[in-house]
């Protein structure tokens, strides 16, 4: 199962997930000026980030919105970025946050687990109900695919719904977590984790999530630019595994800390990943 490959990558390379939420404003001006169009510039930037971090990162997360906003040319860029990572043997998470009834979900599954936009994992929103997961299950069983379901997200507005109190002294996200854990047991890999994972932001603490969701692998966003703390992120791991900690802007814009002109932006990105790994190990 794909979750075993991800688990092995974390064991070998560490738990950092590099987010390719690449905006044109992130590119150093000197680098951007070498290109005649935006799409080629962003793709070359993505390539150099991937190449420089490949041996020290568990996987990559590509946020589709940054590419959709560029229209058809942006979606071609998105396709090329996914392909580049996968052809190198890397694992890529398509951050698409889809969620819909079964007939529509079937098309989403086909769109993002096959063809032009094929990825290894995708993110889904389960708050329409767990029946929205049905069309994806064949891909878990037979086609080496997985998902991360939004459980408790890193944005401030997550408290509007996810944190609502229920009658049994639990919150909405606790109940959703129970469902994710139970459904996931059908798709366990040899590593003991399921190909159905959960998104758990590290901008707020919740010590019981890791204990309660023993078989659920976590995608942990919010580190760095969103204010998530390393000690919180590490609390969601189990002996350094069981999750991946994502950083996007913190890695892509790391050059601004050391090299404002960005002549060595990929080296700065690599150093940021290595520093993240060290911080998460030490705390």
Curated annotation (Swiss-Prot):
What is its EC class?
Answer: lyase
Question: Which keywords, in A-to-Z order, does the entry hold?
Answer: Decarboxylase, Lyase, Pyrimidine biosynthesis
Q: Provide the reaction this enzyme catalyses.
A: orotidine 5'-phosphate + H(+) = UMP + CO2
The answer to whether keyword Protein biosynthesis applies is no
Q: Which GO terms describe its molecular function?
A: orotidine-5'-phosphate decarboxylase activity
Fetch the InterPro entries from UniProt.
Aldolase_TIM (IPR013785), OMPdecase_type-2 (IPR011995), OMPdeCOase_dom (IPR001754), RibuloseP-bd_barrel (IPR011060)
Task: Identify the metabolic or biological route this protein is part of.
Answer: Pyrimidine metabolism; UMP biosynthesis via de novo pathway; UMP from orotate: step 2/2
Q: Where is the active site?
A: 97 (proton donor)
GO BP term, example: 'de novo' pyrimidine nucleobase biosynthetic process
Give the CDD domains listed for this entry: OMP_decarboxylase_like
Q: What is its EC number?
A: 4.1.1.23
Q: Which Pfam families match?
A: OMPdecase
Similarity annotation: Belongs to the OMP decarboxylase family. Type 2 subfamily.
PANTHER family in the record: OROTIDINE 5'-PHOSPHATE DECARBOXYLASE
Protein name in UniProt: Orotidine 5'-phosphate decarboxylase
- Tell me what organism the protein belongs to: Clostridium botulinum (strain Langeland / NCTC 10281 / Type F)
Which gene is the coding source of this polypeptide chain? pyrF
């Amino acid at each position: 199962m794909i979750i075993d490959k991800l688990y092995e990558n974390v064991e070998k390379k560490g738990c950092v997930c590099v987010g390719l939420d690449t905006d044109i404003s992130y590119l150093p001006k000197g680098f951007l000026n070498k290109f005649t169009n935006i799409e080629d510039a962003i793709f070359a930037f993505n390539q150099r980030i991937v190449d420089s971090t490949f041996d020290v990162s568990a996987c990559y997360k590509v946020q589709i919105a940054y590419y959709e906003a560029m229209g058809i040319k942006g979606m071609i860029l998105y396709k090329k970025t996914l392909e580049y990572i996968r052809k190198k043997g890397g694992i890529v998470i398509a951050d698409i946050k889809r969620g819909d009834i079964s007939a529509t979900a079937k098309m989403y599954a086909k769109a993002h687990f096959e063809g032009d936009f094929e990825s290894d994992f995708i993110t889904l929103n389960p708050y329409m109900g767990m029946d929205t997961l049905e069309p994806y299950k064949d891909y878990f069983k037979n086609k080496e695919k997985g998902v991360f379901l939004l459980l408790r997200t890193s944005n401030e507005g997550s408290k509007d719904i996810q944190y609502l109190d229920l009658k049994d002294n639990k919150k909405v996200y606790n109940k959703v977590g129970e469902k994710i854990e139970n459904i996931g047991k059908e798709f366990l890999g040899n590593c003991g984790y399921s190909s159905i994972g959960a998104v758990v932001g590290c901008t707020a603490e919740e010590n019981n999530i890791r204990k309660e969701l023993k078989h659920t692998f976590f995608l942990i966003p919010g580190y760095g630019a969103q204010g998530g703390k390393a000690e919180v992120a590490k609390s969601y791991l189990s002996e350094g595994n069981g999750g991946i900690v994502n950083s996007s802007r913190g890695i892509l814009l790391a050059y601004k800390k050391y090299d404002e002109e960005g002549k060595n932006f990929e080296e700065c990105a690599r150093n940021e990943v290595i520093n993240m790994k060290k911080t998460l190990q030490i705390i």
